[in-house]
């Protein structure tokens, strides 16, 4: 792995630290490497949760590396199989990802965080999509994912003017899950990751699958869809060993031992 990415395995939790001075900006090469990391995480049966963060205390990521852009890297360059930053276009990742946002998350950096399932941010974090001021658009998920979270008026202001949103405002709008001090950020993200590990892996996979496939459906149609047998994880979890283990462990007043089958 390159010097730009530091990987740490803590049991079933993978920590990924983006380290590209000065702003943790991402060029196509780094994006490819991040994609390899996330795809390996997806396919590794021993890993359950990933945490992505940035090195330092100022930048989570400034997004696309404008120095690379100035040197000829195109906005529509090939950023790898996972899309920009390796995660924004992985649509079959049924394991949770936590973005531990340690500072500015601008442009593609914000889009990377939005592609995660949870955002825990430091109180000095700030979020923005300034692409329109650079003559481009936030097409690595920002213009697609943010409208699913925020009202149109707020989205329009952010994507058309590049307005920044601070940590507390992001919490009020439900963009982030938690706001903590910089010193507590990684411990808090790890605590959340462990809570996820404590849940059954097949259940987590089924939940992500259901969210992904039914989010645009009316409730009645979604009911029919999930019961039609076309989903991979949902039918499996209903007849799994874990579905037996959970109630049994509860009755026996012990922690469940998940097998993922």
From Swiss-Prot:
Protein's name according to its UniProt entry: Carnitinyl-CoA dehydratase
NCBIfam families assigned: PRK03580.1
Alphabetized InterPro entries for the sequence: Carnitinyl_CoA_dehydratase, ClpP/crotonase-like_dom_sf, Enoyl-CoA_hyd/isom_CS, Enoyl-CoA_hydra/iso, Enoyl-CoA_hydra_C
Family: Belongs to the enoyl-CoA hydratase/isomerase family.
Xref: Pfam families: ECH_1 (PF00378)
Active site: 111, 131
Example GO BP: fatty acid beta-oxidation
Role noted for this protein: Catalyzes the reversible dehydration of L-carnitinyl-CoA to crotonobetainyl-CoA.
Classification via PROSITE patterns: ENOYL_COA_HYDRATASE (PS00166)
Reaction(s) catalysed (UniProt annotation): (R)-carnitinyl-CoA = crotonobetainyl-CoA + H2O
Pathway: Amine and polyamine metabolism; carnitine metabolism
Alphabetical keyword list: Lyase
Enzyme Commission no: 4.2.1.149
Keyword DNA-binding set for record: no
A molecular-function term among this protein's GO annotations: L-carnitine CoA-transferase activity
